[in-house]
């Protein structure tokens, strides 16, 4: 599941069933029981040992920022409203500083425990289309609130509160207080998942 307020454009779940409903009809059957904002788009038969969480090789999250002096009501709880102009080139440089294999303790919520805080970020980039900025980050796994803290740190770079060149030192310190804030959940989307079964990557 995702945290409260976070969105999914692509989400995969698995379950075992003895239902006689044909697999291609399952989405229609399930959608009669789901809330309006949850839709099952496809069902597939997979190997018995498949696990939607453990079998996932990497994920992509997208954080959306609506960068305009005037709010857009259609983006309420769908993008983070930021009225001051943001330099996407500075933000992209800051985002790229997170790429690679690092200890990401400095950008996770304090008080959360995991076996390891080392993750590999395959890409972390910022782009703009009109008033909408997107930070896309793909990794082999994420710590709690990691993407939202990365986004807050990238925003700090745009605000001049730190430089993109400061980020490697912040990561090395493991000190959460040196990184940027955890931005609100409404702008965060899970947008891609990768599995060995290629059918699930389409």
Positions of PLM-derived features:
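Structured-RNA-binding interfaces characteristic of tRNA pseudouridine synthases
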Residues: 1-202
């Amino acid at each position: 599941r995702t945290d409260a307020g976070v969105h999914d454009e692509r989400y995969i779940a698995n379950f075992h069933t003895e239902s006689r409903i044909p697999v291609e009809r399952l989405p229609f059957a399930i959608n009669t029981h789901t809330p309006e904002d949850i839709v099952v788009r496809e069902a597939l038969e997979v190997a018995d040992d498949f696990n939607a969480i453990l079998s996932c090789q990497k994920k992509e999250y997208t954080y959306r920022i609506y960068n305009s002096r005037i709010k857009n009501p259609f983006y309420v709880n769908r993008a983070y409203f930021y009225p001051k102009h943001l330099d996407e080139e500075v933000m992209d440089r800051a985002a790229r500083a997170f790429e690679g294999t690092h200890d990401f303790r400095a950008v996770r919520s304090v008080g959360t425990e995991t076996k390891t805080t080392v993750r590999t970020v395959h890409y972390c980039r910022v782009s703009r289309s009109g008033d909408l900025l997107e930070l896309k980050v793909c990794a082999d796994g994420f710590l709690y609130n990691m993407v939202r803290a990365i986004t807050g740190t990238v925003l700090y770079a745009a605000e001049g509160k730190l430089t993109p060149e400061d980020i490697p030192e912040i990561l090395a310190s493991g000190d959460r207080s040196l990184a940027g804030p955890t931005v609100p959940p409404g702008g965060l989307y899970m947008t891609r998942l990768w599995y060995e079964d290629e059918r699930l990557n389409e």
